[in-house]
Amino acid sequence: MNHFLDIHKTDTAELRQMMDSAHAMKAARKGRPKGQLDEDQPLAGRMVALIFEKPSTRTRVSFDVGVRQMGGQTMVLSGKEMQLGHGETIADTARVLSRYVDLIMIRTFEEATLLEMAEHATVPVINGLTNRTHPCQIMADVMTYEEHRGPIAGRKVVWAGDGNNVCASFLHAAGQFGFDFTFTGPSTLDPEAEFVGYAREKGRRVSIERDPAKAVAGADLVVTDTWVSMHDPQSARERRHNQLRPYQVNETLMAQAKPDALFMHCLPAHRDDEATSAVMDGPHSVIFDEAENRLHAQKAIMRWCLGL
């Protein structure tokens, strides 16, 4: 039994195994209807709980479709239904769910909730997102880069904007997959020192550059994310926009990157805020391949968790 809690907590060779599996499963589905089962149906007879304390469209649909394609069934539980940590303890919830299902995916706010769930569950637990990290997204992003440009090792990845949970998982991936990483954004939104330190300890070059044009110079991949959360009050939204406007990914900024550089955004996006529509729909953009690859990467993660 394997938990998938964070990229840096997983062996490098096993991450490579998952990545190769994701590419192979995607290739095997080429031309098939979306609802047609995979030939081997590795999850036949298995039940997967999808817990959403924090709601999501992409995570829910991609995991649900992935389980169904592999022959399994899903049970989707919202935060309101679960009352995580209120009343019944998370530990007891984990123990009970483990009696009903074969695998648990949880998308939650606090990392502590994820870790407690994994500590007490007797089935594998997958981190669908916490406020600190988003490893499933980055597995899809690395897959997408490899699909278009080959190995990501030795490449320069630039993150523009807020050093958030997705940025944190990119730093974990830099250490595991061997690419260099530059963050450009206001100092108040720098990624946590812990994440930067991890990538550096693994021998990767990690830099912080306040000038976005200098940061993006020679980049192989430019990535950004939303500037605001759905839960942010209006005052915080205005403050964030003022802070981050200089770090918008537009055509002028992308021109500083390599001619064959890719652009990624995990979506949903606020078009013409963190990135212009011209970039999102332009020749560098692979955002919809990136979105699709959540499905294939997560299928590979589920197989690995169950030892299939």
UniProtKB/Swiss-Prot annotation:
The keyword Glycoprotein does not apply. GO terms for biological process: arginine biosynthetic process via ornithine; citrulline biosynthetic process; L-arginine biosynthetic process. L-ornithine binds at N165, D225, S229, M230. Its EC number is 2.1.3.3. Carbamoyl phosphate binds at S56, T57, R58, T59, Q83, R107, H134, P135, C136, Q137, C266, L267, R294. It holds the Pfam family OTCace. Keywords: Amino-acid biosynthesis, Arginine biosynthesis, Cytoplasm, Transferase. Its main location: cytoplasm. GO terms for molecular function: amino acid binding; ornithine carbamoyltransferase activity. InterPro entries: Asp/Orn_carbamoyltranf_P-bd (IPR006132), Asp/Orn_carbamoylTrfase (IPR006130), Asp/Orn_carbamoylTrfase_sf (IPR036901), Asp_carbamoyltransf_Asp/Orn-bd (IPR006131), Orn/put_carbamltrans (IPR002292), OTCase_ArgI (IPR024904). It is found in: Cytoplasm. It is an enzyme of class 2 (transferase). Pathway: Amino-acid biosynthesis; L-arginine biosynthesis; L-arginine from L-ornithine and carbamoyl phosphate: step 1/3. PROSITE patterns: CARBAMOYLTRANSFERASE. It catalyses: carbamoyl phosphate + L-ornithine = L-citrulline + phosphate + H(+). Reversibly catalyzes the transfer of the carbamoyl group from carbamoyl phosphate (CP) to the N(epsilon) atom of ornithine (ORN) to produce L-citrulline. Belongs to the aspartate/ornithine carbamoyltransferase superfamily. OTCase family. This is Ornithine carbamoyltransferase.
